[in-house]
Amino acid sequence: MGSSSKNIEQAQDSYLEWMSLQSQRIPELKQLLAQRRSHGDEDNDNKLRKLTGKIIGDFKNYAAKRADLAHRCSSNYYAPTWNSPLENALIWMGGCRPSSFFRLVYALCGSQTEIRVTQFLRNIDGYESSGGGGGASLSDLSAEQLAKINVLHVKIIDEEEKMTKKVSSLQEDAADIPIATVAYEMENVGEPNVVVDQALDKQEEAMARLLVEADNLRVDTLAKILGILSPVQGADFLLAGKKLHLSMHEWGTMRDRRRRDCMVDTEVIFDACTTVNSGPRPTETTNNERN
């Protein structure tokens, strides 16, 4: 029990370090993007490439830590206690779906294109927008870039489906021999059993391998997308991804806190109503008593 608790604590500490590092990278990305859009020189492009390389390195290091810890507590990554219920409802194989990276690219491309059109229409009336420039946002994706992204998107979805089938098979194994038969034959529900422990150990080992495979797919997908995008587009994409990840964690935590507060308030009201209803009732006065 002590070893298991320590493993979970290490996994949570690793996650908190990862979230902290993402927060630190946001101002770095913002600063370099602002410099690139103001000056537009090759030196700033090189700085952006260097920073995006560091961020990919961050992701690889975090995946390596998870791979090491997952062999000791893999099931904790599939429904992490350090996540909010909202995050766990959206989780896939211990993290985000790699295909969601493409949805983010498309969303940013659409929203930034809309902004550019609005600015263009304002410029017709003499409005001058600041910053920008060729290749300065995801709205500047070329036809060649979009084609490459679409091809990669289809390939990654296929990889996701293969992995989803694997985890589905593992989930079904819980209702198969020997776990199901041992549970049925037990006199007392849930009592320790060596055969079950061995079967569950094998299942956790398989889940750990799948987690590593999923993390590798996430890292590989991110690196390939950045390879298609320009330095500015890649940095913009990473900035949006980090802000989305951190925001979802905060939004999920706030929603969970509101639900808990609401439940507490409801219990207080219920207790108050119960107390009032169970109290002594006033006696009715008869006509004789009034006389």
Curated annotation (Swiss-Prot):
CC per GO annotation: nucleus
Summary of the knockout phenotype: Loss of seed dormancy, but no effect on sugar sensitivity (in cv. Columbia). A T-DNA insertion mutant lacking the long version of the DOG1 transcript (isoform 1) but expressing isoform 2 exhibits stronger seed dormancy.
Pfam family, one: DOG1
Keywords, in A-Z order: Activator, Germination, Nucleus, Transcription, Transcription regulation
InterPro entries linked: Seed_Dev/Stress_Resp_Reg (IPR051886), TGA_domain (IPR025422)
GO MF assignments: identical protein binding; sequence-specific DNA binding
Protein name: Protein DELAY OF GERMINATION 1
Origin species: Arabidopsis thaliana
Function: Required for the induction of seed dormancy. The level of DOG1 protein in freshly harvested seeds determines the level of seed dormancy. Determines the temperature window for germination by regulating the expression of micropylar endosperm-weakening genes through temperature control of the gibberellins metabolism. Regulates seed dormancy and flowering time through an influence on levels of microRNAs miR156 and miR172. Regulator of seed maturation interfering with abscisic acid signaling components and activating ABI5. In cv. Cvi-1, enhances glucose induction of ABI4.
